[in-house]
Amino acid sequence: CVRFAARVIRGVRPEAQAPMWLRARLSRSGLRSISAVVDVTNYVMLELGQPMHAYDARHLDGALVVRFARPGETLTLLNGDVLELEADLLLVCDERKPLGLAGIMGGEHSGIADDTTTVYLEAAYWNPAVVQGRMRRLGFTSDAGYRFERGVDPALGPAAIERATALILAICGGRAGPRTDARAVLPARN
């Protein structure tokens, strides 16, 4: 992971619904409406090309880290699949547990729920090499994984965070914290 942009938004109204225009855009693109926050992250993915993930911040224990899976770890994904994790799977984790498969799909435990009021937004750049072939081997696909396999612009993360923040505040209310933007060495542009 060479770039990881994030922001916490507190005080969102969990009962808020995405406006009809946004839900219609998702539907026309083959995506179903899930919740206002998740709909916004999916819309921003369609609009800018940057996959995002939203976590329910109350289920995060400490700082997030990116690491490879350890022997014996398991993860229940948002699609309900329970995985026994293999050492070549890159994960987003908090200080105690895996939260999701990096660039592919988030975990069920930390996903946005009907009563989520504090959201942790993530927009990262995942190297295609750590995503390619993993979904096929695991037996499922995701829109994020599809895009990361083919490459996403490493510079898009901060813009995606800002766009998603503006939409979430307009639709769900809340107070946005500062944006964090962790970087490593970016790949050379051709």
Task: Label the model's feature ranges.
Residues 1-190:
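RNA/tRNA-interacting regions in translation and RNA-turnover enzymes
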